[in-house]
Curated annotation (Swiss-Prot):
Topology versus the membrane: Multi-pass membrane protein
EC number annotated for this UniProt entry: 7.1.1.9
Provenance organism: Paracoccus denitrificans
Cross-link entry 1'-histidyl-3'-tyrosine (His-Tyr), positions: H276-Y280
Protein name (database record): Cytochrome c oxidase subunit 1-beta
Length: 558
């Protein structure tokens, strides 16, 4: 330790070899980059599943997923018996990988690890080795997930076709050991997230810069802190549910088997008690990123800092008391339904506070439409659409009609695929220059945004109409009446897929040939959190001399 203290900010020379730096890292910045990189790879796999599903749904009838063998080119002359199991496997792994292995690791593990310590002026995380363990457990979870996909499952085929929620009795009766591997994958990734959450909570509470009281902490650090509490309180519940599943499958218990006095609805309650906080775990770090981006490019401090923090805390608390709105059709009493309706609508209040505060921040600002700001704008617009359909679905009588239709698919993809993912892209474009020391080409970032914006709206907006017409979710085929909007939805999927491939190209171009960034702050003086006082990329050890108050507290500086 005495050695480390000698090197101040001036020492940029990194003596670590490639293997030491990336495989044995305890450095929060390197681990954050590893999380982002891995989430990107898993994201590509999941997106390929999506495109394959949309290919199948582009026209009525089954053209690609055949029992005779899956194909990528439709052949009208060849016989094709629908392979429902393959379809269910696609649905399942798209959901599991996206939820557990892409968005949470990217936002919480990637940006959270990298920027939360920088925002509060901490030299590193509180437990750097635990941080390393969290990342490698996540990698083990990914490996188990992929192994599950390739292991023998139901119908004498590979993989588990049970949907990402793993409902019994499907998941308890699925043959093969694919399902058990999937359960272990979720276990391991959950343990990884819990360890990460403990680390982040400890760091946030104990390692803030001198003078940085709780309500002077930047909003992104707050969002990650609140997310960590949600993870810590909800993931153990999920672990309990899937452990019971494992027992039912392998050890003869009957937690979810009515014949033995169990109850499958019990599983639904336990799962959704995790599953609803889960969606706030996904979106809250996105909120934090968007706050910083909007403040920077509207060239104004964020409007209503304290209500913004309290709104995130309120969303976090309310997120735990609304879980059964996923289960209106599972036979709840009228009183229960009334309560869950009211509680669900209450969440719209703190969410509304945040949306209107973002609008108020931009109001009267001098807005600059750089790429990160475009993503933030897209986020606001699309997240609001998703929120409005959420209010519709919160009504039990309406949910009777919409439950398990494409209306629900449209709703949660507007919030996640067009909310969280736009948050991730906003963060990437906002910080890639800081993380890599090279800046992306502005035209390419803007083109990527417009491709993704148009493509993703083309996918999911028509699905509202399909849901209104009564098209059920999770089916490989559909009557010809639904063909028109399905076709348009699939075209949108191709555009979005192209935009994602283009994005991968932008990232590699930036890392290897992008314009070098020579200044700590390449945006403007309204990017005023501590990472903008450091060189780009930051040195291996940051804040060895703790930051001074005027570095981050604008009120104090003037």
């Amino acid at each position: 330790m005495a050695d480390a203290a000698v090197h101040g900010h001036g020492d940029h020379h990194d003596t670590r070899g490639f293997f030491t730096r990336w495989f044995m890292s305890t450095n929060h910045k390197d681990i954050g980059i590893l999380y982002l990189f891995t989430a990107g790879i898993v994201g590509l796999i999941s997106v390929c599943f999506t495109v394959y599903m949309r290919m199948e749904l582009q026209h009525p009838g089954v053209q690609y997923m055949c029992l005779e063998g899956a194909r990528l080119i439709a052949d009208a002359s060849a016989e094709c018996t629908p392979n429902g199991h393959l379809w269910n496997v696609m649905i399942t792994y798209h959901g599991v990988l996206m939820m557990f292995f892409v968005v949470i690791p990217a936002l919480f593990g990637g940006f959270g690890n990298y920027f939360m310590p920088l925002h509060i002026g901490a030299p590193d995380m509180a437990f750097p080795r635990l941080n390393n363990l969290s990342y490698w457990m996540y990698v083990c979870g990914v490996a188990l997930g992929v192994a599950s996909l390739l292991a023998p499952g139901g119908n004498d085929q590979m993989g588990s076709g049970v949907g990402w929620v793993l409902y019994p009795p499907l998941s308890t009766t699925e043959a093969g050991y694919s399902m058990d591997l999937a359960i272990f994958a979720v276990h391991v990734s959950g343990a990884s997230s819990i360890l990460g959450a403990i680390n982040i909570i400890t760091t946030f509470l104990n390692m803030r810069a001198p003078g940085m009281t709780l309500f002077k902490v930047p909003l992104f650090a707050w969002s990650v802190f609140i997310t960590a509490w949600l993870i810590l309180l909800s993931l153990p519940v999920l672990a309990g549910a899937i452990t019971m599943l494992l027992m039912d499958r392998n050890f003869g218990t009957q937690f979810f088997d009515p014949a033995g006095g169990g109850d499958p609805v019990l599983y639904q309650h336990i799962l959704w008690f995790f599953g609803h906080p889960e969606v706030y775990i996904i979106i809250l770090p996105g909120f934090g990123i968007i706050s910083h981006v909007i403040s920077t490019f509207a060239k104004k401090p964020i409007f209503g800092y304290l209500p913004m923090v309290l709104a995130m805390a309120a969303i976090g608390i309310l997120g735990f008391v609304v879980w059964a709105h996923h289960m209106y059709t599972a036979g709840m009493s009228l009183t229960q339904q009334a309560y869950f309706m009211l509680a669900t609508m209450t969440i719209a209040v703190p969410t509304g506070i945040k949306v209107f505060s973002w609008i108020a921040t931009m109001w009267g600002g001098s807005i600059e439409f750089k790429t990160p700001m475009l993503w933030a704008f897209g986020f606001l617009f699309l997240f609001t659409v998703g929120g409005v359909t959420g209010v519709v679905l919160s009504q039990a009588p309406l949910d009777r009609v919409y439950h398990d239709t494409y209306y629900v698919v449209a709703h949660f993809h507007y919030v996640m695929s067009l909310g969280a993912v736009f948050g991730i892209f906003a963060g990437v474009y906002y910080w890639i220059g800081k993380m890599s020391g090279r800046q992306y080409p502005e035209w390419a970032g803007q083109l990527h945004f417009w491709m993704m914006f148009i493509g993703s709206n083309l996918i999911f907006f028509p699905q509202h109409f399909l849901g209104r017409q009564g098209m059920p979710r999770r089916y490989i085929d559909y009557p010809v009446e639904f063909a028109y909007w399905n076709n348009i939805s699939s075209i949108g999927a191709y555009i979005s897929f192209a935009s994602f491939l283009f994005f991968i190209g932008i990232v590699f171009y930036t890392l290897f040939a992008g314009k070098r960034v020579n200044v700590p702050n390449y945006w403007n003086e309204h990017a005023d959190t501590l990472e903008w006082t450091l060189p780009s990329p930051p040195p291996e050890h940051t804040f060895e001399t703790l930051p001074k108050r005027e570095d981050w507290d604008r009120a104090h500086a003037h």
